[in-house]
């Protein structure tokens, strides 16, 4: 089924938004390849893009710099387009250790990974939607530039079923097996099928809640229907249905056997090269490992690390780029690069890191040279494959400005009337004492403070010193994982502490209305953390509060500081003019803390993908439980925690993790 994008929202574009939407849409239809949407924090960039998508009515790919921001965007677009296909495409690895070889210590590290089945299902749903409908918006990370199966193979393998079609049951089962579906009569799970008389039930790999029931009679499809695999209740009847492969890497038996032959040819050629260089150990190692893989592929059609032979399986020439998610996009699609100042450099860096590791594996006989072609796209290859694009950022980089050739659409006015923070410059010599006095002023007002330093050591020392002065303070550093990071931000908003110190506080998720002061220590030390874009991004962290201020501690005004101050002042003036013209009185953004922490109340109802589960708080009196009861309670909570993590509900996962820790402590006590 395909339809039109229908934006659902309780408000309409205001401020700079109507003009921005009109310009972006007009330029898109005029064939302009690259545009920049320069939007300040809180100006409604996501809502603006949603309006553009509704007006141009083209399949859209939104790229974000990390999984956390991608999850936030996915949730927002899902709310804007509830009747359309909004999909999520990120790396499906919860944990990934690529295979590697360290020549200095003669250490080979085997590939080790843990795949998140829920995200794998969402990836499959994304590619199916791109191939089968036009009203599709996919939110992705740089995972989109990594190799996938070829779309033509993916399409040619699909099983198209129609009511009244003649198909023998054996033929149907054989086709499902070619799609890598497994037969399971006991438990119908994703990617499996079962046979009961003349009824074949299939749980599509990309489906979250519904399975397919195929009822045959005398070699003819008598009925097609979707049903709930848990209750067996029919959801709706169908006239037609397409079953897509269980994995993006599925291929035909003929293609696999053909690949085996070409791999043998490459092996023979490379072994001769190794023997010629007198690399006997490497040659023996390569022959043994590759021969084992070839036997597995010939017998079962698959082997561990089969992605290293993807060039042979797709029939590509040496050095040719692999098929990626961009090959699934139609030519007239729209590409949106969110936080482009971060995402663009990421895309350029992916290829080089992957290449250096694999070159070592090839050199020492762990892989054939064709493994080098299992790679992400080079930056220039990505540019060629990119459709018409919009770069979205508060601080676009030089690449975006150059590529857009002056097509920069500004989104500087916030509908809330909030003005960019006031900026003050104060001397470095007294920065710590002055900071303490400023923190105390904010605490009296019930506000929070963000402090950014240049090094980890400075952050640790400052945190320790301020803590000794009686200030409730926490330190955010790179070793903290996503869930714990969200928990720290939540605790700051809840007032469990007042000051958050970090090195690079530019990352998403730090837009908190409670923060009225951002302090930047050593602001005059030029470098990555004190560049113009970094300063603007950091200053913007206080842009959600009506009392927002930024203090730059510096003894001189650098070029980056001057540019950041001038740009912020320009934005302040434009917002003031808009407020005066429209009679708007700025008010701080009111964002309920329950939005961040559903678990602040007992017995919270959790919206988990329509499953309607209820997650209850654990009893406070843990000491009343015996060891067996504590162990049982911990097991139940762990299952709930992992489910929340799979559903991208990191705040709830963090809350339950805390409960498990308290239970563990009670058990030890």
From Swiss-Prot:
Domain Helicase ATP-binding stretches: 26-414
Record key words, sorted: ATP-binding, Cytoplasm, DNA damage, DNA excision, DNA repair, Excision nuclease, Nucleotide-binding, SOS response
CDD domains: DEXHc_UvrB, SF2_C_UvrB
UVR domain location: 631-666
Motif interval(s): Beta-hairpin: 92-115
GO molecular function, one term: ATP hydrolysis activity
Entry's Gene Ontology cellular component terms: cytoplasm; excinuclease repair complex
GO terms (BP aspect): nucleotide-excision repair; SOS response
Quaternary structure and interacting proteins, as annotated: Forms a heterotetramer with UvrA during the search for lesions. Interacts with UvrC in an incision complex.
Entry comment, domain topic: The beta-hairpin motif is involved in DNA binding.
Function: The UvrABC repair system catalyzes the recognition and processing of DNA lesions. A damage recognition complex composed of 2 UvrA and 2 UvrB subunits scans DNA for abnormalities. Upon binding of the UvrA(2)B(2) complex to a putative damaged site, the DNA wraps around one UvrB monomer. DNA wrap is dependent on ATP binding by UvrB and probably causes local melting of the DNA helix, facilitating insertion of UvrB beta-hairpin between the DNA strands. Then UvrB probes one DNA strand for the presence of a lesion.
Recorded family membership: Belongs to the UvrB family.
Protein name: UvrABC system protein B
Source species: Xylella fastidiosa (strain 9a5c)
């Amino acid at each position: 089924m395909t339809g039109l994008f229908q934006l659902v929202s309780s408000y309409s574009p205001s401020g700079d938004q109507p003009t921005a939407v009109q310009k972006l849409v007009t330029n898109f239809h005029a064939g302009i390849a690259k545009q920049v949407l320069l939007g300040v924090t809180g100006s409604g960039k996501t809502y603006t893009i949603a309006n553009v998508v509704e007006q141009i009515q083209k399949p859209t790919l939104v790229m974000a710099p990390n999984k956390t921001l991608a999850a936030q965007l996915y949730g927002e677009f899902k709310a804007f387009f509830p009747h359309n296909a909004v999909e999520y495409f990120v790396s499906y690895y919860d944990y990934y250790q690529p295979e590697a070889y360290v020549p200095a210590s003669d250490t080979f590290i085997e590939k080790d990974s843990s795949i998140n089945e829920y995200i794998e299902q969402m990836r499959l749903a994304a590619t199916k939607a791109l191939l089968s409908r036009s009203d599709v918006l996919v939110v992705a990370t740089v995972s989109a530039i990594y190799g996938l199966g070829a779309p033509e193979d993916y399409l040619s393998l699909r099983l198209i079923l129609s009511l009244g079609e003649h198909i023998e049951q054996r033929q149907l089962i054989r086709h499902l097996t070619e799609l890598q579906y497994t037969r399971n009569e006991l438990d119908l799970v994703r990617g499996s099928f079962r046979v009961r008389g003349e009824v074949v039930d299939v749980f599509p790999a990309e489906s979250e809640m519904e399975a397919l029931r195929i009822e045959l009679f005398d070699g003819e499809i008598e009925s097609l229907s979707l049903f709930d695999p848990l209750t067996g209740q029919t959801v709706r009847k169908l006239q037609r249905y397409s079953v897509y492969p269980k994995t993006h890497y599925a291929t035909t038996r003929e293609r696999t056997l053909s690949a085996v032959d070409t791999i043998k040819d490459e092996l023979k050629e490379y072994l001769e090269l190794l023997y010629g260089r007198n690399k006997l150990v490497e040659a023996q190692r390569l022959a043994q490992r590759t021969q084992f893989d070839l036997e597995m592929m010939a017998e079962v059609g698959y082997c561990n690390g089969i992605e290293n032979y993807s060039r042979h399986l797709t029939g590509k020439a040496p050095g040719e780029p692999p098929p990626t998610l961009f090959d699934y996009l139609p030519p007239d699609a729209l590409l949106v690069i969110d936080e482009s100042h971060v995402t663009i450099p990421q895309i350029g860096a992916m290829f080089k890191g992957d290449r250096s590791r694999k070159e070592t594996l090839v050199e020492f006989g762990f892989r054939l040279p064709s493994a080098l072609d299992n790679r992400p796209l080079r930056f220039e290859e990505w540019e060629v494959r990119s459709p018409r694009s919009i770069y979205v950022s508060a601080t676009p980089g030089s690449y975006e400005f150059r590529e857009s050739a002056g097509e920069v659409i500004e989104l500087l006015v916030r509908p809330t009337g909030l003005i960019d923070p006031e900026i003050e410059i104060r001397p470095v010599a007294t920065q710590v004492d002055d900071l303490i006095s400023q923190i105390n002023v904010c605490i009296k007002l019930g506000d929070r403070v963000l402090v950014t330093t240049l090094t980890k050591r400075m952050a640790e020392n400052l945190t320790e010193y301020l803590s000794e002065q009686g200030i409730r303070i926490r330190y955010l550093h790179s070793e903290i994982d996503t869930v714990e990071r969200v928990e720290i931000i939540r605790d700051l908003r809840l007032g469990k502490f007042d000051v958050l110190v970090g090195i690079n506080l530019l990352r998403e998720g730090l837009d908190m209305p409670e923060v009225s002061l951002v302090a930047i220590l050593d602001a005059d030390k030029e470098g990555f953390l004190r560049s113009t874009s970094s300063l603007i991004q950091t200053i913007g962290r206080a842009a959600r509060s009506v009392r927002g201020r930024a203090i730059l501690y510096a003894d001189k005004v650098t070029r980056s500081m001057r540019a950041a101050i001038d740009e912020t002042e320009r934005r302040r003036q434009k917002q003031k003019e808009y407020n005066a013209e429209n009679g708007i009185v700025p008010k701080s953004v009111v964002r309920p803390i329950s939005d961040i922490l559903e678990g602040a109340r007992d017995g919270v109802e959790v919206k988990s993908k329509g499953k309607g589960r209820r997650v209850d708080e654990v009893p406070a009196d843990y000491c009343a439980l015996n060891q067996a009861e504590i162990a049982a309670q911990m097991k139940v909570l762990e299952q709930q925690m992992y489910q929340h993590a799979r559903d991208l509900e990191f705040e709830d996962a963090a809350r339950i993790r805390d409960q498990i820790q308290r239970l563990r402590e009670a058990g030890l006590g």
